[in-house]
């Protein structure tokens, strides 16, 4: 086991706080509409330029191991806030630094760290309640655009494209962000349900200019096993042929004789069919087939439920207004499913989302809800260079998370004002001891820090602005983008309540843990022996030896 180095009390805290300050000072330069960029070196390729707090935090690793403890703890604040709320990482970092710095003064003056922590917890709980009272729901597309713009560092075009996407697919719809091919941001919306499986044979294509198999008013056969014998399919094919409507077959696979017969029938115009593989794998495949069945008003033909392909009738088949099958995906438009059944299915999946433990499962379940309830929107981010593209894409993703948080819990006035207004709830608080009162006082000072940082980054005098805003009421605050005071909600300077709340809770949680630490243990750096000198070229002096 490697040897350890241990530091105690103030000696440990001072070193740890030094690390907190290094990371926080790098991150907080990005806060506000006039925040600066940070350039991150990459081990290969071009450097990355970013204004995203969590991206900066994740890159920082300090040489001094005690300082690194502080940096990593604050990095955890940023990451947790990003995971929970999707934004507010810089605000959380600034708050954590403020609580640590103020708290350290009290600890050095002999206050009890445990009581300080209790006071901090009381003050934060009161501030969170006040934030909830200040919060107002987001109802209009304009408000969604404003929240997105603020989160994307005052880029109105990003806010607008996110608002447009939410208009098209609904607030529950899936919105994904991808690299674009042009200089402009683009929005693509897929109406209906789309899954990532295409036609099994190019001979199914009937629209050469779009390279798709387009089926109007088709039947949909959904089967959970492989189809290789055409005899199994014949009864249902004959019934569909009599109706003179096209047929889409979704099965685990269609191969051999069955596929060949379908292709020949299609080419000769006897029966217009297309076959695709079922989406997903394992249990997820079963669930997705069930989704498709409910959307189209059909039934999954499965041996598990006592059904067989030979006995399938037209009543077991789903229907849709139109289906387009491309090389790599299939889109079902306007399925004939019953509205109440679809609603019940969506409700069932939402219940599964609540219980899901992994992010991956949750994401896949949300995708299924969107495909049933709304649609899928793709924002393609355009930029001139790859470096700009990465930076812009990160901002779009941040803005998207922020707008989702705003829809979930509402919005409060931005620009650090909501935290200042929360001071009135903290001011009247009394702790059980003088040390707890010190913890409450500490939060009163810390909640000013985000506004101070925004103002400093904008090149103005922080103390003057903070006092002016405190003398105002409600939404009155300082708009750093214009350098003017006014009603921030009217001016569109909004923050999601969830983001502000999460930032404060996470910052106070980690910072108060740091203040109660009395010892720090790190691994000693091993002194590596100097590398052996290189052997001289050739084996001099060995010539003349007889072998």
From Swiss-Prot:
Keyword terms: ATP-binding, Chaperone, Cytoplasm, Isomerase, Nucleotide-binding
Gene Ontology CC terms: cytoplasm
InterPro entries given in the database record: Chaperonin_Cpn60_CS, Cpn60/GroEL, Cpn60/GroEL/TCP-1, GroEL-like_apical_dom_sf, GROEL-like_equatorial_sf, TCP-1-like_intermed_sf
Any GO MF annotation of the entry: ATP binding
Record-level GO BP terms: protein refolding
Family: Belongs to the chaperonin (HSP60) family.
Subunit organization: Forms a cylinder of 14 subunits composed of two heptameric rings stacked back-to-back. Interacts with the co-chaperonin GroES.
Function: Together with its co-chaperonin GroES, plays an essential role in assisting protein folding. The GroEL-GroES system forms a nano-cage that allows encapsulation of the non-native substrate proteins and provides a physical environment optimized to promote and accelerate protein folding.
PANTHER family xrefs: 60 KDA HEAT SHOCK PROTEIN, MITOCHONDRIAL
Protein name: Chaperonin GroEL
Organism: Bordetella parapertussis (strain 12822 / ATCC BAA-587 / NCTC 13253)
Gene that encodes the chain: groEL
């Amino acid at each position: 086991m490697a040897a350890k180095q241990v530091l105690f009390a103030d000696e440990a805290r001072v070193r740890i706080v030094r690390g907190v300050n290094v990371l926080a000072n790098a991150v907080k330069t990005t806060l506000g509409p006039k925040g600066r960029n940070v350039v991150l070196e990459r081990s290969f390729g071009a450097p990355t330029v970013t204004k995203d707090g969590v991206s900066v935090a994740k890159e920082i690793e300090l040489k001094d191991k005690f300082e690194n403890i502080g940096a990593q703890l604050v990095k955890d604040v940023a990451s947790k806030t990003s995971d929970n709320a999707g934004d507010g990482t810089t605000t959380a970092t600034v708050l954590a630094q403020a609580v640590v710095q103020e708290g350290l003064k009290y600890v050095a003056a002999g206050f009890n760290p445990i009581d300080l922590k209790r006071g901090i917890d009381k003050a934060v709980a009161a501030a969170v309640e006040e934030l909830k009272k200040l919060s107002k729901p987001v109802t209009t597309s304009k408000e969604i655009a404003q929240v997105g713009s603020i989160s994307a560092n005052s880029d109105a075009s990003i806010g607008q494209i996110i608002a447009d996407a939410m208009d098209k697919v609904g607030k529950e719809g899936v919105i994904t962000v991808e690299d674009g091919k042009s200089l402009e941001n683009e929005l693509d919306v897929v109406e209906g349900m789309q899954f990532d499986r295409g036609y099994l044979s190019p001979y199914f294509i009937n629209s050469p200019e779009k390279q798709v198999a387009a089926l109007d008013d088709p039947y949909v056969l959904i089967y959970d096993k492989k189809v290789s014998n055409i005899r199994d399919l014949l009864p249902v094919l004959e019934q569909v042929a009599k109706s003179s409507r096209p047929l889409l077959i979704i099965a685990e696979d269609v191969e051999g004789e069955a596929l060949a017969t379908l292709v020949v029938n299609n080419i000769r115009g006897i029966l217009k069919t297309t076959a695709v593989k079922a989406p997903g794998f394992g249990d997820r495949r079963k669930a997705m087939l069930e989704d498709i069945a409910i959307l189209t008003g059909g039934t999954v033909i499965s041996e598990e439920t006592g059904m067989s392909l030979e006995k399938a009738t037209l009543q077991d088949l789903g229907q849709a207004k139109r289906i387009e099958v491309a090389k790599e995906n299939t889109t079902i438009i306007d399925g004939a499913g019953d509205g109440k059944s679809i609603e019940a299915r969506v409700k069932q999946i939402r219940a599964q989302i609540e219980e899901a433990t992994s992010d991956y499962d949750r994401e896949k379940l949300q995708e299924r809800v969107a495909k049933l309830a709304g649609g899928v929107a793709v924002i393609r981010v355009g930029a001139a260079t790859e470096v700009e593209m990465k930076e812009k894409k990160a901002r779009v993703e941040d803005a998207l998370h922020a707008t989702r948080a705003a829809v979930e819990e509402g919005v409060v006035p931005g620009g650090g004002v909501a935290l200042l207004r929360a001071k009135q709830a903290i001011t009247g608080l009394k702790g059980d001891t003088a040390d707890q009162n010190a913890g409450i006082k500490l939060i009163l000072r810390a909640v000013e820090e985000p506004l101070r940082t925004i103002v400093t980054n904008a090149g103005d005098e922080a103390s003057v602005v903070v006092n002016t805003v405190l003398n105002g009421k409600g939404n009155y605050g300082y708009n750093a983008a214009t350098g003017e005071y006014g009603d921030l909600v009217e001016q569109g300077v909004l923050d999601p309540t969830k983001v502000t709340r999460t930032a404060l809770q996470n910052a106070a949680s980690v910072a108060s843990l740091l203040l109660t630490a009395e010892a720090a243990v790190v691994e000693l750096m091993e002194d590596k022996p100097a590398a052996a000198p290189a052997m001289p070229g050739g084996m001099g002096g060995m010539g003349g030896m007889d072998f």
